[in-house]
Regions:
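Acidic interaction surfaces
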Residues: 2-118
């Protein structure tokens, strides 16, 4: 491998981590996109129709919204989402979130105790 390939991979890794952190720390995205996806996934698991490959598409709606908001908040006026976060990077973020949140759901992270208001 060439040195430039290592640099590109490191940059992509940083972009993936940056966008993932932005998503996990944005209250509006959490309420508007994240929790409805979690609810949908829990419903699909309960009905035994969960398909991990199809769930990536659901997470992409969240990731695309987050990428647009990130560029709007931190980017310059001439930057485009596709330049800052290419589709491969956004897909990788969706995959990371899908894997992590499936594990969290299986561990009962989003199960509300009986008698609580959610």
């Amino acid at each position: 491998m060439r040195a430039s390939q290592f640099i590109i991979e490191a940059l992509d890794s940083d972009a993936v981590n940056e966008l993932d952190l932005y998503i996990m720390n944005n209250e509006d995205l959490y309420r508007r996109r994240f929790m409805p996806i979690i609810t949908n996934i829990r419903r699909k698991i309960k009905r035994n129709i969960y398909d991990h490959n199809k769930v990536i598409k659901m997470w992409m709606y969240l990731v695309d919204d987050a990428a647009r908001e990130y560029v709007k908040e931190f980017g310059s006026k001439d930057q485009d989402v596709k330049d800052v976060f290419p589709k491969e990077t956004r897909l990788q973020v969706a995959q990371v979130i899908a894997d992590r949140e499936l594990e969290n759901i299986k561990q009962g992270e989003y199960d509300a105790p009986k008698g609580t208001v959610s």
